[in-house]
Amino acid sequence: MRLKELGEFGLIDLIKKTLESKVIGDDTAPVEYCSKKLLLTTDVLNEGVHFLRSYIPEAVGWKAISVNVSDVIANGGLPKWALISLNLPEDLEVSYVERFYIGVKRACEFYKCEVVGGNISKSEKIGISVFLVGETERFVGRDGARLGDSVFVSGTLGDSRAGLELLLMEKEEYEPFELALIQRHLRPTARIDYVKHIQKYANASMDISDGLVADANHLAQRSGVKIEILSEKLPLSNELKMYCEKYGKNPIEYALFGGEDYQLLFTHPKERWNPFLDMTEIGRVEEGEGVFVDGKKVEPKGWKHF
């Protein structure tokens, strides 16, 4: 069997089975050490898969930190220390690496964390691996959704996918709303403003990186429940609506299946809604399995590596 036949999540299940691990399966790995609750996570960004060399190096550096911080936040933690390993072509301009680390530095200053080391190796294409350590008072994973919980998301959904499509068009000139969408793809901001809310109230939580339906399916499987989503409640930005109107697209499809938004998906009782956060109730946790949109079961078709 080839990896493309097994699939990304089939491979993860195989690794869990081989290692006999009870920890693997959340956005981070929770570890208790010297009375501290640590959250460990790692993400890889590869040239040609996650970004192109033509992208602004500072944005790539920002994103490399942000996608890891998003995992820590999703589990109710704050980022503390990072290690960065780089695979670099020998003909790469030194200025590219310098600008990459300027982006890293800006992200670390914003999220109040610190790069404490890393590694460098030669390769054909750029590869970036970030290992991040966070701390929390209460770990919130994917397996705690309760029957009757409301399902919430932060921010708006689908913007990153539209931004990527615009980038790939390689237009000579973009409209302001198009530039805003491109910015949301190149420079996502992890929702650090949600940490206290997730830590205090959420029963289950994860970030949205593979697409809403795909990630809701992960949460539903881990919690042993069904998630019902109402499409009319999905939060859509004005920029996404303008993009879809201009290019004849359906914004609901982008919200449901677009990846790399790095917003949060979480569940808790309806009455714990916080009016001071940009959270939207999009559905409910019910008895059953899988993800349903407007009463119809939907199979996940978000981002997959294999």
UniProtKB/Swiss-Prot annotation:
Among SUPFAM superfamilies, the record links this protein to:
PurM C-terminal domain-like, PurM N-terminal domain-like
Give residues annotated as binding Mg(2+) 2: 43, 71
- Residues that, per the record, bind Mg(2+) 3: 27, 71, 207
Keyword entries, A-Z: ATP-binding, Disulfide bond, Kinase, Magnesium, Metal-binding, Nucleotide-binding, Thiamine biosynthesis, Transferase
Q: Which GO terms describe its biological process?
A: thiamine biosynthetic process; thiamine diphosphate biosynthetic process
Q: Which residues bind Mg(2+) 5?
A: 210
Would I find ATP-binding among this entry's keywords? yes
EC?
2.7.4.16
Q: Per the record, what are the reactions this protein catalyses?
A: thiamine phosphate + ATP = thiamine diphosphate + ADP
Give the residues the record marks as binding Mg(2+) 1.
42-43, 119
Query: What Gene3D superfamilies does this protein map onto?
Result: PurM-like C-terminal domain, PurM-like, N-terminal domain
Residues noted as binding Mg(2+) 4 in the record, renumbered to the chain: 27, 41, 71
Among the Pfam families in the record, one is AIRS
Q: Where does substrate bind?
A: 50, 260, 303
Assembly with partners or alone: Homodimer.
Q: Which family does it belong to?
A: Belongs to the thiamine-monophosphate kinase family.
> What does the further note read?
Reaction mechanism of ThiL seems to utilize a direct, inline transfer of the gamma-phosphate of ATP to TMP rather than a phosphorylated enzyme intermediate.
Q: What is this protein called?
A: Thiamine-monophosphate kinase
